[in-house]
From Swiss-Prot:
Subcellular location: Secreted
Record lineage: Eukaryota, Metazoa, Spiralia, Lophotrochozoa, Mollusca
Described function: Alpha-conotoxins act on postsynaptic membranes, they bind to the nicotinic acetylcholine receptors (nAChR) and thus inhibit them. This toxin binds with high affinity to both fetal (alpha-1/beta-1/epsilon/delta subunits) and adult (alpha-1/beta-1/gamma/delta subunits) mammalian muscle nicotinic acetylcholine receptors (nAChR).
Record-listed 4-hydroxyproline modification sites: P7, P13, P21, P22, P27
Species name: Conus ermineus (Agate cone)
Keywords assigned by UniProt, alphabetized: Acetylcholine receptor inhibiting toxin, Amidation, Disulfide bond, Hydroxylation, Ion channel impairing toxin, Neurotoxin, Postsynaptic neurotoxin, Secreted, Toxin
Disulphide linkage map: none
Domain-related comment: The cysteine framework is IV (CC-C-C-C-C).
Post-translational modification: Contains 3 disulfide bonds. They are not added, since framework IV presents two different connectivities (I-V, II-III, IV-VI and I-III, II-V, IV-VI).
Keyword Ubl conjugation: no
Protein name: Alpha-conotoxin EIVB
């Protein structure tokens, strides 16, 4: 489960954004 409305196959520990990529599992900045 990734952040955002839509799941992403390539999730990275970067900043979570809703509405536009990247959708990440763990929000840690931008």
């Amino acid at each position: 489960g990734c952040c955002g409305k839509y799941p992403n196959a390539a999730c990275h520990p970067c900043g979570c954004t809703v509405g536009r990529p990247p959708y990440c599992d763990r929000p840690s900045g931008g």
